[in-house]
Swiss-Prot record:
Alphabetized InterPro entries for the sequence: ARPC5, ARPC5_sf
Organism, scientific name: Dictyostelium discoideum
Protein name (record): Actin-related protein 2/3 complex subunit 5
Region (Disordered): 1-21
Cellular compartments per GO CC: Arp2/3 protein complex; cell cortex; cytoplasm; cytosol; pseudopodium
Similarity remark: Belongs to the ARPC5 family.
Subunit record text: Component of the Arp2/3 complex composed of arpB/Arp2, arpC/Arp3, arcA/p41-arc, arcB/p34-arc, arcC/p21-arc, arcD/p20-arc and arcE/p16-arc. Interacts with carmil (via the region between the LRR domain and COOH-terminal proline-rich domain); carmil is required for Arp2/3-dependent actin nucleation. Arp2/3 complex, MyoB, MyoC, and the alpha and beta subunits of capping protein all form a larger complex with carmil.
Length: 138
């Protein structure tokens, strides 16, 4: 990812909690709007944009993760690969972080394994290595 490690969890490159909360509220509206319009790919792009990786506030990360994980869980199995194919490397890394977070919940595991398979297929093992070695969490 194109973030500087010195800024990890320090808030230096991040926003205030109030700004993150406003962004998350807007993200939720945009994701819902895209889904209601039958545009799950647009919803995915919005959901993966600007994750709150620089905040130490777990509630903010949880709130954003809920939006992303609910979206990922709503995809039909057959649409996952098509959606992953349109993502760039940074989006793949962010998506893989959410996939691991989703798998950790133990809910909807089959769909998260499908996402994992497709991200790995497109991004290669480097995606996994970057995600597990990176300090910034979602």
């Amino acid at each position: 990812m194109n973030y500087e490690d010195d800024n990890v969890e320090s808030g230096q490159a991040g926003k205030s909690d109030a700004e993150y909360k406003a962004d998350i509220a807007n993200r939720e509206k945009e994701v819902t709007k895209a889904l209601n319009a039958g545009k799950p790919q647009d919803a995915l792009n919005v959901a993966l944009a600007d994750p709150p990786i620089y905040t130490k506030t777990g509630a903010i990360k949880d709130q954003n993760a809920t939006i992303v994980l609910n979206l990922l869980g709503s995809f039909k199995d057959k649409d996952v690969e098509t959606s992953v194919e349109t993502l760039n490397d940074d989006q793949l890394d962010i998506l893989m972080k959410y996939v691991y977070r989703g798998l950790a919940t133990g809910e909807n595991s089959p769909i998260f394994f499908k996402w994992h398979e497709c991200v790995l297929k497109k991004g290669g093992a480097g995606t996994i290595i970057r995600v597990i070695s990176e300090k910034k969490t979602v």
